[in-house]
Structures are given as C-alpha cells and as structure tokens.
Amino acid sequence: MKVLVVGSGGREHAICWKLSKSPKVDKIYCAPGNAGIAELAECVDIKAMEFEKLVAFAKENSIDLTVIGMDDPLVGGVVDVFEAERLRVFGPRKNAAILEGSKAFSKDLMKKYNIPTAAYETFTSAKEAKKYLETAEYPIVLKADGLALGKGVLICENKEDALAGVDELMLDKKFGTAGDTIVIEEFMTGREVSVLSFVDGNTIKIMSSAQDHKRAKDGDQGLNTGGMGNFSPSPFYTKEVDEFCKKYIYQATVDAMKSEGRPFKGVIFFGLMLTPKGPKVLEYNARFGDPEAQVVLPRMKNDIVDVFEACIDGTLDKVDLQFEDNACVCVILASDGYPLAYEKGFEIKGMENFKGKDDYFLFHAGSKFNEEGKVVTNGGRVLGVTALGKDLKEARAKAYEATEWVDFDNKYMRHDIGLSLIH
C-alpha cells in the first residue's frame, strides 16, 4: 500500500520509520518532510496547511492511507477534507481535534464530565482577567486558548507577572488569535507524565508513558520549549496511577467526546500531573507528541498500519497493543539560542555513523538540503538522538554516547535528560 504522512518534524520522521517497518507498506510519501525523512520517503513540496493540494496529491497517486502528524492541520479540519473525498485518513476530525485546539473547550469538557483537572476560569476580556488576578492565589497558570507551538503557557509567581502575562497573551497578541481567550488555572505541583493512546471513537488503548523535559537549560532552567528530550517509560507512571487513570480519565474522555457528538479517532496524548491528591489532566493533544513519538514508537511491537486502520474502522478492541519491556531515551540537539533567536543553515556532519546500528536512531526535526545538496540545520530543534536499552540507565548512556557522533556549528543540548532517575 501507499502511505502519505503530513508534517516535517522529528515526530513525522519517527512515524515514517515505523511505517517503513510494515510489510504492508510499499511506498511512503511525506509532505513536506525533511532531509532525514527523505531517506525513508519521497518528500513532496506541499505544506501541511495546503489541504486541497494534499487531497489532489492523494487522489493522483492512489494513496491508500494518509497519516496527519501535526496539530495545525488537524485543528484546521484536514481530516474532514480528506473524508469528504472518500480518502482513508488517520486523525481526528475538526470537531474532535478541538480537544487540543481550544483549552477552554477541554477544561469545560473535563468539568462537565468530572474528569480530574486543575480549578480554572476562562476569560475573553483582559480587563476581567486582571480583575480576577487581584484576589487570586499565587503561583498561578495562564494559558492561551488556541495553538501556540506548545509555548502558550505562562507560570506566574506573583500578581505583577500575571498581569504582564495577560498583556502578553491578550493585548500584545504574542501568539496571535490563540490569546483571544485565555484560561487561568490553579498551579498544580507534582510530576508531569505524558501518556499516548490510540482511540477509535469508542475504544481506547494506551501505548506507553513518557517523560518530557520542556525547559531549554539543564536543571529545568530557562524558557519553555517544544521539548528538549524525553524518555519512555516513565517510572512515575506506576500500576496505581495507571489503574486510576483507566478508571477516571482515559475512557471517560473518549466517552465524553462521544456524548458531545464529537467522536474522537486518532491519537490522544494525555498530559498528566501526578499531584499529592492523585493524577489530574494538565492538557490534551490530538496527535503524537514530539519528541514523545520518538521514544514510544521504537518500543512498539505491533505493525502500526494495523493499528491506524483499526482506529479508522472502529475495530481497535480487536488489537492487542504490545510494547517491548525496555526503555528509550531521546536527546534533542538544538540550535544554540532556541527557543529565541538562532542561526540556521549549518552543515550537519556524522549522520552516517547511525547506519546499521540497531538500537540507535537519528530522527530529524529541523533539517533540509541546501543548494549544493548538503544536509543543513533548518530549525530550533534539529535532531533527536535516540537509543533503546534494557533499562533507562543503558538507554540514556547510549543516547548521550551517540550525541557525539553527529555535529553542526551551533549544536546545543541538555545534559540531564533522565539523569534524576539514575542516581
């Protein structure tokens, strides 16, 4: 079969790699893809938001399955456009992708269906938001309602910071229309854990847990990023946590969406906070995380095509989802200066060192071919150096060893991904 993957990051590289392992897949296309994905797939020069062009390409090339990796096209309704043309596509429709597309929607859903989450209020007026902040308890969290590249969340230690945050989101429009509405919620303490799941509208199957490192610098210092590294599974995601979430969060979310007339088919990413009072939902994403996909998919035993098709066809209950009893660590190599200003266009050297090494992966996030055909950096997050091991300690040692195999001029990374768990 022929498969089209939509997106250009490390997540899409991991999806393409997993698809390439399926005996059912003869040919992979990726739109727009990147220089790393080009080794596995034919990259097509169509952007993720060019829905009509994507549909036309899928029809002209008799694509059997399209997989949407990114959040923007999902929230924008790309799945509806494909389905209207009777094309098979993996991902939630627009009316279900709102689970990620609007923080206010997801918070209201959790409140209505008693899914554990932080207390919150929603505001469409900066004046009202500021009035509320006068008597609020601190620290407090401000969130842009819409998509903001994973960076639209501000943790404010005091009233001054919070008032400035309202200005930033609602008046200065730092994230554009994403800040027209904001959610202000209580600050929760505890461990953050990510859990990925497959959903077919009725049934939910949990993949695995993962642990993200959002801050730019070692010791969780610096600015929030899209993620500087990850590992799977998370040792904090215990059997007790799993049982609680299965009882009160996972199926409850799927059922809530169905009750609202918004059946969800695709991947739900649960951002959880393990608080002293039990697990609570921080956020939902309507797709694989990045770099969560890079640490979860290499551990998955199943043929991913079978799972994608079961989600589309509503037969996920018949799938026995299985994962290796191992660990995976991904360390992001970024452009120095990310997530603020950084230079790009530097040649990436040493990629050939990953060839033929079973437990090592080099997932490209921000790379492209320059005019001379050399692979160069093309983003803040450039590469995801990833390794499997029998446990976290081994996987971590292998991943950090492999970060030395590849180089570019302004290479920057965190040195403490997964470190706290090894002492």
Which residues fall in each region the model found?
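ATP-binding N-terminal substructure of ATP-dependent carboxylate-amine bond-forming enzymes
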Residues: 1-94
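Active-site nucleotide/adenylate-binding loops and adjacent lid/helix of ATP-dependent enzymes
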Residues: 4-5, 100-181, 211, 235, ...
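Solvent-exposed alpha-helices and their adjacent loops that cap or buttress functional pockets
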Residues: 21, 36-38, 60, 90, ...
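Short, charged, surface-exposed secondary-structure boundary motifs
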Residues: 38-40, 53-55, 98-104, 217-218
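Internal nucleotide-binding/catalytic subdomain
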Residues: 156-293
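Active-site "cap" helix and flanking loop/linker of ATP-utilizing ligase/carboxylase catalytic domains
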Residues: 246-268, 285-357, 370
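Generic C-terminus detector
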Residues: 367-372, 376-423
